[in-house]
UniProtKB/Swiss-Prot annotation:
GO molecular function, one term: Hsp90 protein binding
Tissue expression per record: More abundant in young embryos, pupae and females and a lower level expression seen in late embryos, larvae and males.
GO terms (BP aspect): protein folding
Keyword set includes Cytoplasm: yes
Protein name: DNA polymerase interacting tetratricopeptide repeat-containing, protein of 47 kDa
Principal location: nucleus
Domain of life: Eukaryota
TPR repeats (start-end): 91-124, 129-162, 163-196
Purpose: May act as a co-chaperone for HSP83.
Compartment list: Nucleus; Nucleus, Nucleoplasm; Cytoplasm
CDD domains: CTWD_Cns1
UniProt entry tagged with the keyword Nucleus: yes
Length: 396
């Protein structure tokens, strides 16, 4: 065999020169290849957006209305297609979705997923019990206690020894103030685990709340009875005095109601007519209007034994805000009341008590209060007020 020629000894400069030559030849080869645009990938300006849509890289589940990646649609079909899954598998897939939403506190989406699982009509009672219990939990977290209780009870129907569902039932029953059911659920939990601390605590809390509500109900019932008794006494006193109300229809005597006695004037609305402590004197809310100034004064509690002069003495102690001439003073004013039924006014005798004025044939309580008009005596304002055209009230 022929001996091979001895290898050439390369210097460093020769090696560098050869490497540069090979790089240049490779670049020339690449530049000589046919140019073709890359069109099969994601556009550079939407690369991140497309990445987020891809089922392998997405960071969150698609929301309603989002564009869904075709691969994601395919995976969904594999997961939810009835032809690809049994009823149990479909129910478990929806349960898995619901648990995912529960973990991320998307409780309404969780309710939707668990509901879809129930709709699969799986025959597995354990799966149905879990779906109902989990949907009960989702309802509970958004305070849909009635729906939560209903689902927890359904879970117990499919799985009578389901501790979680029984505890959820107890919690919902407490929130809904169904105290007997809460007691029953807690006692059943304690039959299984006598040392169940949360059940013991809820049982005690439930008992205390029941006692408190029953006590409050007794107080409210007693107060309602007292209020009704006071109203009946007030009604009898008003009827005995034959007091008339302009809200009552002509020719008809309506049964007196609290609404009829309720003052319609804002400053008086919390001070309806009532009897004094000994039950002998009516205390009235009253309004005194000054037509000249479009201004009113209010008495929140005015005994019927008060004379009109006493009322004026109090009202006119200080100068009225708009009375620059100081015409409105005791002895220099007249007081009227209006009979809206027939559309006329009546002058008030200042020496009479309110009870006497109210008893006059033409006087009607207006809007739950006594209403009087004060005008400057013998003035143009008084004449205009008296002669003002008034239309009688019309009732059907």
């Amino acid at each position: 065999m022929k001996q091979m020629a001895a290898q050439k000894a390369w210097t460093d400069e020769e090696r560098l020169e050869l490497a540069a030559q090979l790089d240049a030849e490779l670049d020339a080869f690449i530049d000589g290849l046919e140019k073709k645009r890359y069109e099969e990938g994601w556009p550079e300006d939407r690369w991140q957006e497309e990445m987020d849509k891809h089922p392998f890289f997405m960071k969150r589940a698609p929301q309603p209305g989002d564009d869904v990646h075709p691969m994601f649609e395919g995976l969904q079909k594999l997961k939810y297609d009835p032809e690809e899954n049994t009823r149990d598998e479909l129910a478990l897939n929806y349960k898995e979705d619901g648990n995912f939403y529960m973990k991320h506190k998307k409780f309404r989406m969780a309710i939707y997923s668990f509901t879809e699982g129930i709709k699969t009509k799986t025959d597995n009672p354990d799966v149905l019990a879990v779906l109902y219990n989990n949907r009960s939990a989702a309802h509970f977290f958004i305070k849909n206690y009635r729906s939560s209780l209903s689902d927890a009870q359904r879970a117990l129907f499919y799985k009578p020894d389901y501790t979680k569902a029984r505890w959820r039932s107890a919690q919902c029953a407490y929130e809904l103030e169904r105290f007997d059911l809460c007691t029953q659920m807690c006692e059943e939990l304690l039959e299984v685990d006598v040392d169940n601390e949360v059940a013991i605590a809820l049982l005690h809390k439930n008992k205390m709340k029941k006692l408190e509500i029953e006590r409050n109900q007794r107080k409210e019932a007693a107060e309602a009875k007292r209020r009704l008794t006071r109203f009946h006494r007030l009604r009898d006193a008003i009827e005995q005095r034959a007091i008339k109300f302009d809200d009552q229809k002509v020719g008809k005597k309506d049964v007196l109601s609290e609404e009829l006695l309720y003052p319609k004037f804002l400053p008086l609305e919390d001070h309806p007519v009532h009897l004094d402590e000994d039950g002998s004197t009516l205390i009235w809310p009253a309004a005194f209007s000054y037509p000249e100034f479009l201004y009113s004064d209010f008495y929140q509690q005015l005994p019927e034994t008060t004379t009109m002069r006493d009322c004026l003495a109090t009202l006119l102690t200080e100068k009225l805000p708009y009375d620059k001439a100081h015409n409105y003073r005791l002895g220099n004013v007249h007081v009227y009341y209006e009979n809206r039924k027939v559309g006329c006014v009546h002058k008030v005798d200042e020496e009479k008590q309110l009870a006497e004025i109210i008893a006059e044939k033409g006087f009607f309580v207006s809007g739950g209060a006594l209403l009087f008009y004060v005008v400057h005596k013998d003035s143009r304002v008084e004449q205009e007020f008296i002669n003002e055209r008034r239309r009688p009230m019309v009732y059907s």
